């Protein structure tokens, strides 16, 4: 499996990890598996931010898939795809850490970096380089 596909594997797991972080703690309010979305909607602090990071991670997954598909279909060199994929993963991990830690400006910069990697993959695929 290529590095870019391992990054895809990690990217698929990121929303699940974020959901787990959102469900840890709670100050005595135990997780309600019968109504998980309502329970998560009442979270505050790091739990609410982790839940938001989960939602954004699902969105980023689609963006990465589009970029990866375009790059492979466009015949982009595997090494370049791998570099952009790894950069995307680093940006996304940093994004989640910043989101949960309430570092909003740094989080936005990480989001821009990750999105930029996806856009670059799509553009390179479209150019056929």
Residue ranges and their predicted role:
Residues 14, 55-68:
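Core segments of transmembrane alpha-helices
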Residues 93-116:
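Interfacial loop-to-transmembrane junctions
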Residues 78-88:
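Structural signature of hydrophobic alpha-helical transmembrane segments
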């Amino acid at each position: 499996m290529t590095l870019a596909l391992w990054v895809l594997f990690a990217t698929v797991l990121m929303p699940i990890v974020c959901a787990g972080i959102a469900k840890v703690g709670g100050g005595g309010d135990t997780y309600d598996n019968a109504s998980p979305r309502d329970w998560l909607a009442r979270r505050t602090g790091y739990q609410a931010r982790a839940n938001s990071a989960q939602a954004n991670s699902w969105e980023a997954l689609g963006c990465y898939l589009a970029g990866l598909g375009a790059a492979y279909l466009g015949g982009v060199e595997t090494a370049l795809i791998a570099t952009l994929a790894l950069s995307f993963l680093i940006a996304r991990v940093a994004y989640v850490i910043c989101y949960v830690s309430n570092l909003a400006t740094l989080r936005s910069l990480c989001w821009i970096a990750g999105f930029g990697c996806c856009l670059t993959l799509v553009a390179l695929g479209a150019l056929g380089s």
